[in-house]
Amino acid sequence: LAVVESNFNPDARSSANAVGLWQFMSYTGKSFGLARSWWHDERYDPEKSTVAAAKYLKHLHKRFKGNWELAMAAYNSGSGTVRRAIRKAKRAGKPTDYWSLKLPRETRGYVPAFYAVATIFKDLEKYGFEPLPQLMDLPPKRAVVVAGGVPLKQISEVLKIDSQTIRLYNPSIRL
């Protein structure tokens, strides 16, 4: 789903102000444990936002009675949008599966996009793609707590680490 959401770009921002790898809106991110302030936004943190996305998807999967297609549609457009489409279909005596619902255009293409990406990722070479590179081994992380308001340049100088490296390890810092 992260490919469909952001093309694996942790700095992605949508026109609706959903941000990060998993394209969390502010309220949804907060609801699933992602902190946000004027200098820090965990929606941009790949590790923390992935944990939050897993929790959110689990919640949606349960809400839509084990139906992953409806859960993914709700991840994209909101559970209220999907619930309203289901109610409308029921009132009209129509099926309530993902493929039959009247959903927003973007959401109608969301699950097929996920299936397409999943199919390609299962056999990249068959579809003309290079195998994925191995993930680089990053050195172990160590947390250093810094008082708010300390300029990144000062942190960089004290730790003797360039600001780009600090940003690499701390993608949730908003500069």
Language model segments and positions:
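Short alpha-helical scaffolding segments that buttress acidic/His motifs in well-ordered protein cores
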Residues: 1-2, 75
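Short, surface-exposed glycine/acidic/tryptophan-bearing loops
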Residues: 12-33
